[in-house]
Amino acid sequence: MKKVKVCSPGTSANLGPGYDIFGLALSKPYDTLEVEKTEKGIIISVEGEKAEEIPTNVDENTAGVVAKKMMEDFNIQSGIHIHINKGIKPGSGLGSSSASCAGVAFALNELFELNLSKLELVKYSSLGEAVAAGAPHADNVAPAIFGGFTLTTSYDPLEVLHIPVDIEVLVALPNIQVSTKTAREILPKEIPIKDMVNNVGKAAGMVYALYNNDLELFGRYMSKDCVVEPCRANLIDGYLEVKEKVKDLVYGITISGSGPAIITIPKKEHVIDIENIFKEVWNCPVYYTKVGLGCYVEEIE
């Protein structure tokens, strides 16, 4: 095997009260990564969404950091060329950096037949997230690797719970700049016990709803975060207006990750109405998509 091409999905993290725990894989948008064996070194090339803004230096690129660590740990002597086609806009709140991290880990596992488990792939993938967010975290890379709905419940040791789900979501991507680091820095360092109780209860209810195929309950609780969303809502101009306008058209709505992307669980009969509201307020791209299966191999040579 000389070359492998992998599709790596966009993801939505937090989903309201599940801050830094919940993650959801999407069928679109997605990145594609081609990883090819070379004689030596790591070369990175990028095309697609905001490619000119993505560093190709190995130590500054999220995929490069992951690849370098894996190649060191497994004493891989050959080189590689990583070509990333960005279908996920960086800084979108849809796990753009995570897609690169997860995609390259998944590709190297296939290319060099490392036989790593999905949990081990999440662990390596999360290392690249430190470049984008300042610290390793797995709430996006976990669903990118596992697919479906994931809960990252511990980091030491790393524990990820996985629930396969069949849900359709409608995602808006406003043309607004939101820094992940800024969005994390504005969060409170301490919260009242009543807010903790609310979020723990709603998060637990969302898992219950998934097991009972109750979209109405899942969406209602997804919309009830009282810790993170109130801090970030004003970073996304028009969000509170949209939330009010679509409240009877969706089961739930919240900010995807750090934003600016907005994720909804739409009532099917109102998908067009919701899209029109998104376009009226933001004039932005909209994705109507299903929960995805995670990274997969598209081609092998």
UniProtKB/Swiss-Prot annotation:
Among the GO biological process terms of this entry, one is: threonine biosynthetic process
UniProt-annotated binding residues for ATP: K89, P90, G91, S92, G93, L94, G95, S96, S97, S98, A99
What PROSITE patterns is this protein classified in? Answer: GHMP_KINASES_ATP
Please state the pathway this protein functions in, per its UniProt record.
Amino-acid biosynthesis; L-threonine biosynthesis; L-threonine from L-aspartate: step 4/5
* Entry-linked InterPro entries: GHMP_kinase_C_dom, GHMP_kinase_C_sf, GHMP_kinase_N_dom, GHMP_knse_ATP-bd_CS, Homoserine_kinase, Ribosomal_Su5_D2-typ_SF, Ribsml_uS5_D2-typ_fold_subgr
One Gene Ontology cellular component annotation held by this UniProt entry: cytoplasm
| Cellular compartments annotated | Cytoplasm
Q: What class of enzyme is it?
A: transferase
Sorted alphabetically, the keyword list is: Amino-acid biosynthesis, ATP-binding, Cytoplasm, Kinase, Nucleotide-binding, Threonine biosynthesis, Transferase
| Molecular-function annotations in GO | ATP binding; homoserine kinase activity
Name the catalysed reactions.
Answer: L-homoserine + ATP = O-phospho-L-homoserine + ADP + H(+)
Q: EC no.?
A: 2.7.1.39
Q: Record's family?
A: Belongs to the GHMP kinase family. Homoserine kinase subfamily.
UniProt function note? Catalyzes the ATP-dependent phosphorylation of L-homoserine to L-homoserine phosphate.
The protein's name is: Homoserine kinase
- Origin organism of this chain? Methanococcus maripaludis (strain C6 / ATCC BAA-1332)
